[in-house]
Amino acid sequence: MSLLAGFRVVQMGHGLAAAVCGRLLADVGADVVCIDPDTATPLAAYLNDGKPVVSRDALATADLIICEGRPAELRAQQRDADALRALNDAAALVFISPFGQSGPKANDPASDLTLMYSSGIARLLTGQVDDLSEAPIRPVGEQSAFIGGLAAACAGMFAAQPHMSGAIVDVSIEEALATMAMGELTSAGQHGRSRSRKRLTDGNGATVCILPARDGYTAISPREDRQWASWLVAMGSPDWGNDPRFATKPDRVANWDALHTLMSAWSRPHDKQWIADTAQAARVPSFPLRELAEQLESPQLVHRGFWRAVGPDERTAKAPGPPFGLSVARQGGVAEQPRGPLPLSGVRVLDFSWVIAGPTTTRYLAAMGADVIKVEAPGRGDPGRDSGLHTVLGQGKRGIVLDLKQPAAVGLARSLAERCDVLVENFATGVMDRLGLGAAELQQRNPGLIYVSASGLGRTGPESHAVAYGTLLQCYAGFAGLNRHPDVPPRVGFAWLDPMCGLMLAFIVAAALWQRRRQGGVARVDFSMIEAMLWTLAEPLLETQRGAAPVPQGDRSDRHRLHGAFRCAGDDEWIALAVG
């Protein structure tokens, strides 16, 4: 049983973001058809694979209509809201454009490069730098289209809830990209300024860093004191481990450059995979920096059936499939007619998630009207409280402190789950089951509970028990290694994957609620963050299999006559230009 079985979608036009939106909807079972799709590039062909081409007659019966284009273009093509409403007055309409359908920039041209600069993402992507003459860069793989398409799919599913007839959504890709940097936006809003790109002090890598290896690099994150103690033992308890400069996390931040030099001297003689395996054995999050080609034969991804065959004979190439395991059962769900002013009015969410990805998901759900109850541990709480993140991600949520090591607290958690519609958790694999809060037990108690698990590599497969953070998975997937200038070593960079996964998970929850409300099916979701990262890297993965594996190239592009960033007056002022 598909999540969106019977949900009819019409995708209009050549835009890549619209194609991404349609791809995600199709991947969870929606009936997606196209009017005038683009198949001219391998990426466009992959995104539109399996979507029948139809005439405008299909608009009359659609539940959701997706259009990409600037307002003047849409009016000229009779694809604006007035024209579409004349054909279908009940469908949710989703418009995607670089800067939105209104405002002084609404009809301005844009490209992936210029959107990364105008949104502020380019200056954040690689983290702080030693030399401001190093230009900011865009990420690999047409990421503006993927973020814009994900935002459209998420907003579209909220707008298409059964009681939201005739809703209109206006997605600005620039705004969707800017929202990826919630912490930075919060800092700018509270203090009136953003962080400098210039690295002025130690400490930039004290929570996550890249170590040189004999055959490449390994990313590692011994950020907590207990992880640091385990990592010292894994390294053979070096004498410098007793240096008071490194005794606590604040000490390691203050003396990071000296510490990184010592760890690098230890790591250089070893293979990158051995370093990561040694760290993981000590329960310290770590992964080698991989090339994209290495992912194509990953035992973990093969085990989970992530790859799908694409091409005329379905054997031409491997392309990413949906980044989650999904089951939908009629084990007690009952079709319902929701009421209320917002898409998720009346929905209650039990939130066991923490840090960035899960709390981002539940923040979106709260904004759409859900009653979110956030569960935190006594004393420790969500690490997001240590930064400005909680100011944003904690909005609109209620909270409860439960010590889940105590049977009474577990009993209270079960009681809460019996009264909720959705549960979201991102603990390490096996934790919720050991607590007696696993999907099988809670869905037996509450047959209508939508249970969403998010983890680094998924809940099944040979690597399912690896401990992970989103920034490390950016390195493991091959993303971080490509996001740099050719002569610059790889950096971990900005936490890109976490907020992107939050957006995708919010979409999945909205789709699961549509299914339960309309057809009574109840979903169990097993979400893999690395699969989500690779899902957005479809273009470089396809290029790799054609013998044109991508290499770091900064802001350069082979598809444009002029494409790059140019320095202007000021310490760190740049302009991005893209000429076709």
Regions picked out by a protein language model, each given a short descriptive name:
Residues 43-56, 117, 389-404, 475:
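N-terminal glycine-rich dinucleotide-binding loop that anchors FAD/FMN and/or NAD(P) in oxidoreductases
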Residues 79-123, 437-446, 450-481:
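Rossmann-fold NAD(P)-binding glycine/threonine-rich loop
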Residues 133-142, 212-215, 487-497, 568-572:
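Flexible glycine/proline-enriched surface loops and loop-helix/loop-strand junctions
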Residues 39, 379, 386-392, 406:
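Conserved core of the PLP fold type I
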Residues 119-138, 477-493:
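The feature captures the short pre-catalytic strand/loop hairpin that immediately precedes
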Residues 361-364, 390-400, 406-420, 440, ...:
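C-terminal structured domain segments across diverse proteins
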Residues 1-41, 51-102, 147-381, 410-414, ...:
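Acyl-CoA thioester-binding alpha/beta core of soluble enzymes
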